[in-house]
Each structure stands twice: as structure tokens, then as C-alpha cells.
A protein has these predicted regions:
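An amphipathic alpha-helix signature
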Residues: 55, 275, 331-339, 403, ...
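Long, amphipathic alpha-helical coiled-coil segments characteristic
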Residues: 390-420
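Residue-level signal for inorganic ion chemistry
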Residues: 17, 27, 58, 98, ...
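Glycine- and acidic
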Residues: 6-12, 39-44, 206-211, 259, ...
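N-terminal Rossmann-like or analogous alpha/beta NTP/dinucleotide-binding catalytic cores
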Residues: 1-123, 221-233
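Helix-rich, typically C-terminal accessory recognition domains appended to large enzymatic cores
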Residues: 419-465, 469
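Catalytic adenosine-cofactor/nucleotide-binding cores of aminoacyl-tRNA synthetases and other
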Residues: 231-385, 393, 449, 453-491
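Active-site cores that bind ATP or allylic diphosphates and position pyrophosphate for catalysis
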Residues: 97-100, 105-106, 110-240, 246-252, ...
Length: 491
């Protein structure tokens, strides 16, 4: 049995968008599930679209995601070079062989001649398919034009194909009328191969067993197969995958400002969570399990569970999954992950490890950290209506009573190095005051944070702030509440 070999063959045109990354992941999983090889090949034949530094982005992204390649431009292998522009002389030779085999021909037509045919088709209301007169030229006529230095492209020759079909692992048997296939360009006038032709040659040369790509290539595959057949080569196994959609009507697209992998990481999503989530875009495991490590995905991945239907990218689902990853981290890994964000957000003399602990159950993405902990450095001029809480049964009057009592208690409290002792101290207060826990703890939390939503409760926040700052903030609350409560009493 031949070894399973897949390839990820991106063009160096910028950032890695989610659809591309999902294709790379599927290719990686197909190969690794079968104990095979995953190759990286750079397809840079379209020199106009090439972006400086984009190859490094590809390397960096794949490494961050754990998609380590077995062969590629940087590490070599038995089938290199792995950059198409470094393989240029080879393609021309293969194209000339294909001409001899009757699968291709020289085309000397000008853009004007092609455009004239297009306009004629439009005027007749029929779909345009270029009917190339050059394929009827004799060998002598072709040679005379070549000797005269006429510019040319090499086109695929398609004739008398009739009904043709191929089998796809996802979409099953695909039948196509050969008469609708157009004679695509294989070698451009600048000598560069087109993406379509270079792909076929490279896949064969590199012994790629499974070609994984977007379902938009289903319609081109019969043309590829004619080339495989003309050379007498074995066709690869085709795995066409559905698109990743922004919504029911729009594909995810970097051009439309949709998030790339780099954008998501910059927003505070974890590479492992992103990979887990995109594995489930268009593929479903046999169980209800949703959280998978890459190694677990390798074990359970099955081509036949790839869906034919488009997958919709749901940022809320990714956010939820990212939160699960953050909460499942061991203490040390988690702290090292959030520390840069905490150092940026908190500059006061506070224990960042303690802050990290209280935010772990409450954040889903790393970029939520700054906003959730900004009150440690600065107590804002908050709305006093926050002291009014129906569920907690608090009003400004109740809050003022609670804050005055808590200030007195905390001034006498001297075990600020123990969260448990502080917990015991503050939870004893409601009983003494014959109040409910929330009637005391909600006002304290409001006073020490100035926020309606905080990553921790009153006791946790007070413990991190320490005695002096906690008492200062409670006094601010007392002073401000005294003004409105007294005003109410006067009226």
C-alpha cells in the first residue's frame, strides 16, 4: 500500500485566513491519521500577488498551530525544491511532453482575438468558451510561428471527451459533460506555469496521494484528470472540502476584513483553541465531544465525516471554546499565558498571581483581561446607583450602613495575609448587623471596584488591594453615599 502523503501549498500573498488554515489542518490530520507525511510547498508562480515576508508568516503560523511538516522549503526532503519558482525549468519540459502526447498545444492568439469571441458569445446570449483555432495548426505552421518569435501560451487540448466522471471522498461521484470544459492555459506567455498546471506536476512528482482543496475546484478537476490520463499517471484521491462562511450568503474573506489567524491571536484567542474550533468547521466526530487536542484529532479524524455543506464561522462558539481552554490550563501555563496582559493592565503593587486566579473562571479571551482588571490601578468616579441592587436587596441607605460597619471591622482586622481569615471576618459581619450576605458584600464590592461586573467578589478584591487601599476606597464610598443619603433625608 502506498504511503499517505498530503501537501499544504499556499501562495505567499499575506496573512493566513481561516479557510486556508482549516485546509492545512485537514491535510495534516489525513496524513498523520494514516501514519503518513505532511508536506509544505510554496506556490509562488503568481509573482504579481507575492507579498514580502508572507512565507515567514506561513512558517510561523503552522508552527504556532502545531502543524509540523515532514518536508518543505526550509527542511528539504527527497522531492525538492519545495518552492514552485525554483522548479520553473521543469514545467516547460512537461508541457512540451504533453503537446507530443496530444494533451496540449501552442496558442498564438492575441487578447483581441479572444475578446472578439467573448463579445460574440455575449451577443448570442451563450456562455463563453474559447474555441482556439491554433489547435488545428500543423506542426510545420507551429514551428514557423515559433521560429518567427511570435508570443504564445501553451493551452490544454480538450477534444471528444464526452461524459466524464471522477470520485471524490466527500462529494461522491461527480459527472461532467466534457463539452463544457475550457482549454485552460498551462504555460503563460512569460514562461511561468499557471497554478493549475504546476499543481498537477508537483503533486505527481512529490507522490501526493490525497489532494485536499476547496470545493470550488470540483469543476476544474475533470481537466486535471485529462492531464493525469494523458501522461499515464495515477490520479490522486480527491478530498474537496466545503467553504467556511461568514454567514449563509458570504464566504469568509480577508478582503472583506474577516479575521485571519493572526487577527484572532491578536484579539486574545489561543492557537490550540482556534485549531480545535476550525477542525469542527465542516467535520464532525462520531461522539458529542467538542474539546480535542491535536493528538486526539489525529486519532479520531475520518475523511468520511467531512460534510458537504458549508460551515459557518461562529465567533461566539470560538469564544466559548477559548474560555474552556483557559480554564483547563494548569496553573503555571495559565499564569505565563495571562501574565503579559496583566503586566500591561496593572501597574500597582498587587500580586498578579492572585489577580490571575480570580479572572481564570471569568474570562474567555485574553483581550478581556485589561478591561476586567483596570479598577485595581484606578477607582473611577462610578455611578452611585450601582449600590441599588434588587436581587441583593441593597439601597444607598443599606449600603452606607454596611460600608460604615465594614470599615470599622476591617480597621481592627490584622490578618491581611490570609484570604481565609478575611473571608471569615467579612462573612461574620452580616450576622452581626442582622443583614443578608449580599447586603454587606455587594456594597463592599462596589466600593472597592467601582464596577458593576468584576472578576472576583468583594473578599477576593479586598485581599488583593490590601488593607490601606481597601479602607481608602470604602471611605470614598462612605463619603459619596453620605451626600446623597443626607440629601434624601433633608428632603
Amino acid at each position: 500500500m502506498n504511503k499517505t502523503r498530503t501537501r499544504f501549498a499556499p501562495s505567499p500573498t499575506g496573512y493566513m485566513h481561516i479557510g486556508n488554515l482549516r485546509t492545512a489542518l485537514f491535510e495534516f490530520l489525513i496524513a498523520k491519521h494514516e501514519g503518513g507525511d505532511f508536506l509544505l510547498r510554496i506556490e509562488d508562480t503568481d509573482q504579481e500577488r507575492k507579498v514580502e515576508g508572507a512565507v515567514d508568516v506561513i512558517y510561523k503560523t503552522l508552527k504556532e498551530c502545531g502543524l509540523n511538516w515532514d518536508e518543505g522549503p526550509d527542511i528539504g526532503g527527497d522531492f525538492g525544491p519545495y518552492v514552485q519558482s525554483e522548479r520553473l525549468p521543469m514545467y516547460k519540459g512537461y508541457a512540451e511532453d504533453l503537446i507530443k502526447l496530444g494533451g496540449a498545444h501552442y496558442c498564438f492568439c492575441s487578447e483581441e482575438e479572444i475578446e472578439a469571441q467573448r463579445k460574440e458569445a455575449e451577443s448570442l446570449g451563450i456562455s463563453f468558451k474559447f474555441n482556439d483555432p491554433c489547435k488545428h495548426l500543423s506542426a510545420e505552421e507551429v514551428q514557423a510561428k515559433l521560429d518567427a518569435g511570435e508570443p504564445y501560451v501553451i493551452r490544454q487540448t480538450i477534444k471528444d471527451v464526452g461524459e466524464t466522471y471522477f470520485d471524490d471522498e466527500v462529494y461522491g461521484r461527480i459527472e461532467v459533460d466534457g463539452d463544457v470544459l475550457d482549454e485552460q492555459i498551462l504555460i503563460k506567455s512569460d514562461g511561468y506555469p499557471t497554478y493549475n498546471f504546476a499543481n498537477i506536476i508537483d503533486d505527481h512528482q512529490m507522490q501526493i496521494s490525497h489532494v485536499v482543496r476547496g470545493n470550488e475546484y470540483l469543476s476544474s478537476t475533470p481537466k486535471y484528470n485529462l492531464i493525469y490520463d494523458a501522461y499515464g499517471w495515477q490520479r490522486p484521491t480527491y478530498v474537496h472540502v466545503p467553504p467556511v462562511m461568514k454567514d449563509e450568503h458570504h464566504k469568509l474573506s480577508k478582503r472583506n476584513g474577516d479575521a485571519s489567524f493572526q487577527d484572532l491571536v491578536a484579539k486574545g484567542y489561543l492557537p490550540d483553541a482556534i485549531m480545535n474550533y476550525i477542525a469542527l468547521l465542516g467535520w464532525a466526530p462520531e461522539t458529542e465531544q467538542e474539546i480535542y487536542t491535536l493528538d486526539e484529532l489525529i486519532k479520531v479524524f475520518n475523511i468520511h465525516r467531512i460534510s458537504k455543506s458549508p460551515a459557518i464561522f461562529d465567533i461566539d462558539k470560538l469564544t466559548w471554546m477559548n474560555g474552556v481552554y483557559l480554564r483547563n490550563m494548569d496553573e503555571e501555563t495559565y499564569y505565563e499565558t495571562v501574565r503579559p496582559y496583566l503586566e500591561k493592565a496593572v501597574h500597582g503593587p498587587y500580586n498578579l498571581k492572585e489577580i490571575a486566579k480570580i479572572i481564570q473562571p471569568r474570562i474567555d479571551i485574553l483581550n478581556q483581561i485589561e478591561e476586567s482588571v483596570d479598577f485595581f490601578d484606578t477607582l473611577v468616579d462610578y455611578d452611585l446607583e450601582m449600590y441599588r441592587h434588587k436581587k441583593m436587596k441593597t439601597t444607598p441607605e443599606v449600603a452606607l450602613k454596611a460600608l460604615k460597619a465594614s470599615k470599622q471591622t476591617l480597621e481592627a482586622f490584622d490578618q491581611w495575609d490570609s484570604m481565609d481569615a478575611l473571608h471569615e471576618c467579612l462573612l461574620a459581619l452580616p450576622k452581626e448587623l442582622e443583614m443578608k450576605n449580599g447586603q454587606v458584600l455587594w456594597p463592599i464590592r462596589t466600593a472597592v471596584s467601582g464596577k458593576q461586573f468584576t472578576p472576583g467578589g468583594a473578599i477576593e478584591i479586598a485581599f488583593i488591594l490590601g488593607k490601606d487601599e481597601t479602607l481608602r476606597r470604602i471611605q470614598v464610598g462612605i463619603d459619596r453615599l453620605s451626600e446623597i443619603v443626607e440629601d434624601d433625608e433633608e428632603h
